Structures are given as C-alpha cells and as structure tokens.
C-alpha cells in the first residue's frame, strides 16, 4: 500500500541532491545502531509518494516517488545523514514553482495536513516530513501547473536555513540562468 508524505527540505538541498531526501542522524545513537532523528523517515518505503516542499522559499518543487530503502550517506554537502533516492513524477513548468501560500489562501481547497490554514506553518515546524492523505497529495499534484498558484524562480527567496548554516554555508545562493546554484 502506497503512503504519502510532505517532505520539508530547502532549495539548497534540492539543488545539491535533487535525487534524494535526507534526515539527520539522532546524535545520541551508538555508531552500530544509528537512527534517523525523525522516526517517520524509517517508515517510508519504495514506491511511496512525496510532495517536496522548500522551506523558506514557500514553494512545492514537485511530486516524487521513493526509489530506495533508507541508507547511510555522507558527502561534503550532506555529511552523515540517512537518505532515500527519489525520482520526479511531476514537476511544475520549467522556471516555475507552486507557491504554497497562494495555493492555501487563494483557493477554496481544504487540506487535511493543514486543518487551520492560518496556522499552516506550525504543522511543519521542526519536521523533516509529515504524513499526508492521498486527497492532499492529489491536490498538490493537480496544481503543479495551475498558473494562478505558480511563481517564477526570480520571485522566490532562497534563504540560508539553519541546516545549511550547520553545514558551513552562510551566504544565500543565487539561481543562475542555467538553473544551477551560483556563488558556492
């Protein structure tokens, strides 16, 4: 049975590893028994569906299918994390993103994951991912090309998140004309 998740990362993480999602490791675990900081990350399975949200930029980057089991991963961008490989199912039109605030406040949609639209951000605070209903997933998917909810890449901010600061990145990146991060 397919499960559905709302993954909270940031634009920088997506540009670094757009084919993966990650979760920090619990600091108190023994090396032989490493565990993800958010236990729900363990529950994700191959074939599950995710909505990829870029925190701080307020945009949905697309919907994806999980392609791998959880595995340990480490490189200079993502040192010592658990990852899962992902593959895009549907992305917004090139150079555009689905703006979550526009979708929430300029539509009549009700979302199970955000029972109180005014407090939508509190449902995500401190989360890497959150379980969502298929109905919510379908609403996000359906609106990835709905022009009234889209913003261009030039309209979004890419803040340096606490995760990125912890990795030694203190300057906000810029998206180049080729869609890559510049200034890093």
Question: Where in the sequence are the language-model features?
Answer:
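Compositionally biased, charged N-terminal/linker segments
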Residues: 1-46, 132-168, 179
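Active-site metal-binding core of divalent-cation-utilizing nuclease and nuclease-like domains
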Residues: 170-184
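GIY-YIG nuclease signature motif recognition
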Residues: 7, 63-64
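Aromatic- and Lys/Arg-enriched surface recognition patch
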Residues: 65-130, 134
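Short, charged beta-turn/beta-strand-edge "cap" motif at the junction between a beta-strand
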Residues: 54-59
């Amino acid at each position: 049975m397919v499960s559905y998740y709302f993954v909270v990362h940031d634009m920088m993480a997506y540009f670094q590893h757009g084919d993966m999602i990650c979760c920090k490791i619990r600091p108190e675990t023994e090396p032989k028994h490493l565990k993800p900081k958010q236990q729900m990350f363990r529950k994700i399975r191959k074939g599950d569906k995710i909505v990829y949200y870029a925190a701080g930029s307020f945009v949905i980057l697309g919907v994806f299918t999980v392609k791998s089991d959880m595995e340990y991963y480490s490189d200079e961008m993502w040192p010592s994390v658990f990852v899962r490989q992902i593959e895009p199912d549907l992305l917004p039109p090139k150079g555009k993103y689905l703006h979550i605030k526009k979708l929430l406040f300029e539509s009549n949609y009700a979302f199970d994951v955000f029972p109180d639209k005014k407090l939508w951000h509190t449902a995500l605070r401190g989360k890497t991912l959150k379980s969502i209903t298929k109905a919510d997933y379908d609403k996000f998917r359906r609106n990835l090309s709905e022009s009234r909810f889209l913003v261009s890449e030039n309209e979004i901010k890419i803040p340096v998140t606490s995760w990125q600061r912890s990795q030694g990145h203190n300057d906000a990146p810029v998206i180049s004309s080729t869609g890559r991060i510049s200034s890093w």
